[in-house]
Amino acid sequence: MKHADLSQRQLRVGEQVRHALAHMLQRGILLDDALKDVVFSVSEVRMSPDLKIATCFVSFLNTVDDISRATLIKVLNKHSRFIRGEISSSLRQMKYMPELRFRLDNSFDNFSKIDALLRLPEVARDLHHHKPED
């Protein structure tokens, strides 16, 4: 689902959930030993149309391989009820507390791949060659 497909309400509530998650993470509540030394960011939260499901996209900033990232996503999903309870006080205005589902956000990895491609000598030469004159 693209941003254009989401209503203003879904976008607003998603941002509120993201802020509540960020606030909880800043307090340093450790959920699991697997998350002890992991630095991660909740980059986006997308709400379902009925606002009962929040899909939370997470980027890990200091993990190397995809296997450990997948494991960490499983750990977050395992503790989603606890996290939901922790953020509920920040979201008291909501009629229903959404179910949290954590997913890996690959946008930073995709950006890195595109950046690396654009830095290739062949691509840089082509881009420079087709540059319009001022």
Swiss-Prot record:
It is found in: Cytoplasm. Keywords: Cytoplasm, Ribosome biogenesis. GO terms for cellular component: cytosol. One of its GO terms (molecular function) is ribosomal small subunit binding. GO terms for biological process: maturation of SSU-rRNA. Monomer. Binds 30S ribosomal subunits, but not 50S ribosomal subunits or 70S ribosomes. Belongs to the RbfA family. One of several proteins that assist in the late maturation steps of the functional core of the 30S ribosomal subunit. Associates with free 30S ribosomal subunits (but not with 30S subunits that are part of 70S ribosomes or polysomes). Required for efficient processing of 16S rRNA. May interact with the 5'-terminal helix region of 16S rRNA. This is Ribosome-binding factor A.
